[in-house]
Amino acid sequence: EKPSYGFNLLFQSGLLKIIFPELQKLHGVQIREGKSHKDNFFHTLQVLDNISKATDDLWLRWAAILHDIAKPDTKRFNKKVGWTFHGHEDKGAQWVPSIFKRMKLPLNEHMKLVQKLVRLHLRPIALISKNVTDAAIRRLMYEAGDEIDDLLMLCKADITSKNNNRVQQYLMNFKHVEDKIQKVESKDSLRNFKNPITGEKIMEIFDLEPSRIVGELKEMVKEAIIENKIPNQYDAALEYIKKEGKSQGIVFKQK
């Protein structure tokens, strides 16, 4: 129930920096011009304990351990706002395969799940604004797919503060996000969203070789569905890419 205990022992014994140097690097607080950041090592252990109260899923625990792993490498100081860690979620996701390989963990769908959760862990809380569009919710649901519940669980576990009033405010904001996601999901059934037209089908119909154009057309369809410009149907998607391709000067040799 408190896996942080073992990591604390490794930290105190000096073994952590040998076994898991990336996690060790999260330790410490830097102060500049009166502005500091939290100790991301102890924050990570708190997130790990939080998620362990909600689930015994090993891979969600690994997502908790790795969610901020790239913060030391992305740390910058801005005189106006203080310390920033822009892009730590993307860099952290890039690190997941190499960390898994070194730890002799499986490089399969479990690794891909952890990678996805690390990459997306900031996204739900960014949807707090009252003016957030349904399209923004759809985009998150599309990217998270079946793992949307796991992602929300990780984000909730990521709420740590010694100030209980602040925690309650964050939890209230997070509940607002969950309600928005539920509302859009019940209306659009996007949890298992699949693009109605595959890259292979685009190449078959237009006699194209694998290329950047194929990926761009497929992305156009996804964005059009998310923005509610077209229904999630094959015929609508096909007509849309024909029209968009023509407007952008892409010439197809149709079979």
What is each of the regions a protein language model found here?
Residues 1-62, 69-87, 91-109, 198, ...:
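Glycine- and charge-enriched loop/helix tracts that form the active or gating conduit
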Residues 16-21, 33, 67-69, 122, ...:
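Short hydrophobic/aromatic-rich motifs at helix boundaries and adjacent loops
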Residues 19-25, 81, 136, 186-189, ...:
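Glycine-rich, flexible loop/turn motifs
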Residues 64-67, 90, 94, 98, ...:
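Feature representing long, continuous alpha-helical segments
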